[in-house]
């Protein structure tokens, strides 16, 4: 039977309300997020609490989006009570599934009837392990160290042996398709704990691997020459140019990494990958389109790109710089004051940096999400102007509704930012 768009999911990372709105705008099929302390981004994207579960589930239901709650850290005995409280709250709120890495979480989800998906932290690398865990889960994230030939073997085994999850349906394969990669196997790293007493496996990673390092011989004190000081900081994963191979290997849920990244990242990446799947199904997955997606993906946060291990292991794929290599950088301009719905015009107070007609702009907000546009006209005191300076109120047409206190940014090149 020919596959349809409904057979696939683009799963968006949500670490803030702005990112949730951006995921909806971009057409995400599902979102994943964490609350409290038992998730792998507890330190870097800790904006939601247990009290937000019902609202998040309701928002997702209204937009026909599945909601996945991550409870994927190591669980100690002292965590059991909190874990059960969170799982029960997720069940009561109507969260679609819990993403788990600990059998205690899986077992309790099964006990109370909460759907569970398995995290990459489990490092599932073969069909026999998948068979074991299928008693708990309907969707499995395979180890990100696998190549696509290995993924295809697991997919074929699921089909041939009819391996089913608790719902009685064939287990679906989920894989990371884009975003940050950890230098450790399936993200199980102990460097942050060793150096900073902050465990990555408890959601408190301090990103020690992203720093620059020098290599010295301890006996001679001679520094060894290395071509790159970021020797533990991998480039970001990008699979959009071989999405056809991912699909044919059996991947059905495409997970985007990035709960600590901004709403502009979420909207851009989700739109690109959603378009890639649609193009594959329509037979228009062309080199020209790949180039277009590449250019868009470069504009938002990235550390450079590589294929991961999916097409076979490659060495030397390390970041060249600290932080982002995005071709566009955000510069804060000001905040939203008012939206005139009858004419589609927004008013902003310019607080931090001047802007001019023709600048590429970005508006973000908890309900607005991420809106990109380039104004061809701007007015101050109802008069057309080319440049708007700090302290002035400016109005211009916007493509979507905005809200008071939304943030206005202009997008500039790294070189332009450096020259200021």
Language model: regions and residue ranges:
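Surface-exposed amphipathic alpha-helical tracts and adjacent flexible/coil segments at the periphery
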Residues: 1-26, 30-42, 56-57, 63-73, ...
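Well-ordered mid-protein domain cores that form the structural environment of catalytic cofactors
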Residues: 83-119
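Charged helix-capping and loop-helix junction motifs
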Residues: 46-52, 81-86
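Short, glycine/polar-rich helix-capping loops at beta-to-alpha or helix-loop-helix junctions
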Residues: 125-130
């Amino acid at each position: 039977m020919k596959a349809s768009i409904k057979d696939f999911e683009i799963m968006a990372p949500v670490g803030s309300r702005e990112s949730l709105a951006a995921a909806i705008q971009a057409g995400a099929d599902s979102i994943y997020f964490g609350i409290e302390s038992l998730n792998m981004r507890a330190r870097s994207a800790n904006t939601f609490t247990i009290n937000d579960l019902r609202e998040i589930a309701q928002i997702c239901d209204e937009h026909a989006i599945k909601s996945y709650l991550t409870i994927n850290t190591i669980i100690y005995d002292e965590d059991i009570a909190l874990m059960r409280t969170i799982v029960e709250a997720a069940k009561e709120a109507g969260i679609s599934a819990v993403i788990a890495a600990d059998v205690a979480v899986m077992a309790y989800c099964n006990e109370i009837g909460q759907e569970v998906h398995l995290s990459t932290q489990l490092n599932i690398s073969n069909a026999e392990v998948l068979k074991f865990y299928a008693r708990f889960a309907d969707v499995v994230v395979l180890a990100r160290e696998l190549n696509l030939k290995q993924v295809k073997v697991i997919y074929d085994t699921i089909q041939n042996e009819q391996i089913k999850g608790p719902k009685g349906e064939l287990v679906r394969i989920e894989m990371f398709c884009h975003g940050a990669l950890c230098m450790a196997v399936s993200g199980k790293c102990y460097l942050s704990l060793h150096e900073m007493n902050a465990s990555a496996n408890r959601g408190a990673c301090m990103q020690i691997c992203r720093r620059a390092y020098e290599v010295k011989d301890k006996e001679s004190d001679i520094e060894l020459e290395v071509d790159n000081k970021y020797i533990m900081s991998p480039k970001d994963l990008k699979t959009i140019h071989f999405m056809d191979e991912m699909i044919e290997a059996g991947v059905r849920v495409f997970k985007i990494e990035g709960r600590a990244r901004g709403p502009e990242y979420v909207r851009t990446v989700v739109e690109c990958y959603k378009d890639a799947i649609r193009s594959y199904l329509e037979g228009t997955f062309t080199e020209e389109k790949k180039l277009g997606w590449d250019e868009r993906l470069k504009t938002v946060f990235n550390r450079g790109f590589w294929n991961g291990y999916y097409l076979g292991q490659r060495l030397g794929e390390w970041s060249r710089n600290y932080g982002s290599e995005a071709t566009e950088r955000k510069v804060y301009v000001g905040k939203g004051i008012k939206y005139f719905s009858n004419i589609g015009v927004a008013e902003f107070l310019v607080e931090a940096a001047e802007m001019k007609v023709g600048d590429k702009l970005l508006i973000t907000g908890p309900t607005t999400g991420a809106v990109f546009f380039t104004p061809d006209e701007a007015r101050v005191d109802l008069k057309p102007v080319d440049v708007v300076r700090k302290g002035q109120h400016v109005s211009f047409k916007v493509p979507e509704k905005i809200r008071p206190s939304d943030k206005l940014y202009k997008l500039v090149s790294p070189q332009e930012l450096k020259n200021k």
